[in-house]
Design a protein with these regions (language model features):
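Short histidine-centered beta-strand/loop micro-motifs
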Residues: 44-46, 66-72, 89, 98-99, ...
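A short, N-terminal "cap"/entry segment at the start of jelly-roll beta-barrel domains
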Residues: 1-53, 155, 159-186
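Residue-level recognition of conserved beta-strand positions in structured domain cores
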Residues: 55-57, 70, 89-91, 119, ...
């Protein structure tokens, strides 16, 4: 059984707020949020790691490419445990890369690099880790999306109100790039 905590972020959380304390979370019982068609589950964040890294999963159905974005101060990794995810990345010189990642594959996105992804198979899962000098961005998902106690992807997509795109991302080291074009062909 996973213990519940009240935090400044959520009324009910399975993640303790104090850094330096061991804890355990059962599968899927982290802090969950729905955003678009995906479910994000945070297992460790800035509160537990003194803002050095976060650890989360993203589960979703086959769908559209998420909006291109970058993180000025955050490095991000994509490790695929189930399904297939197409990762798009542009390096700092402007060269674009595209790679279909399947179970066991890994992708690394340096800070400041525009990137996006598209889930290519239903029931895909990404394990994400992000770290950088500016802190961590795991609370972005529940602030742009909606916190949930559900254990599955949303029945209907959750699309944030337009005004949230103007305020929430900057608080969490996320810069959306609405005019960005991928030239890789997919």
């Amino acid at each position: 059984m996973t213990i519940e905590f009240a935090t400044r972020y959520r009324e009910r959380s399975h993640i303790p707020t104090e850094p330096g304390k061991p804890y355990f979370i059962e599968k899927g019982m982290g802090d969950r949020a729905h955003l678009f068609t995906d479910m994000f589950t945070v297992y460790a964040g800035g509160e537990q790691t003194e803002n050095t890294f976060n650890f989360f999963t993203c589960e979703g159905p086959k769908g559209d490419v998420i909006p291109a974005h970058s993180h000025p101060d955050t490095y991000e990794v994509f490790y695929i445990t189930d399904g297939a995810v197409r990762l798009f990345v542009e390096d700092l010189e402007g060269e674009q890369y595209e790679k279909l990642l399947t179970a066991g594959d890994f992708g690394f996105v340096p800070k400041n690099c525009p990137h996006a992804y598209r889930i290519e198979r239903h029931h895909s899962r990404i394990v994400g880790v992000a770290a950088g000098p500016g802190g961590t961005f795991e609370r972005f998902f529940e602030n742009l999306g909606i916190p949930t106690d559900e254990l599955a992807v949303p029945q209907r997509p959750y699309v944030p109100e337009p005004h949230k795109f103007a305020t929430v991302p900057q608080q969490y080291d996320v810069n959306f790039l609405p005019d960005h074009k991928w030239r890789t062909g997919n």
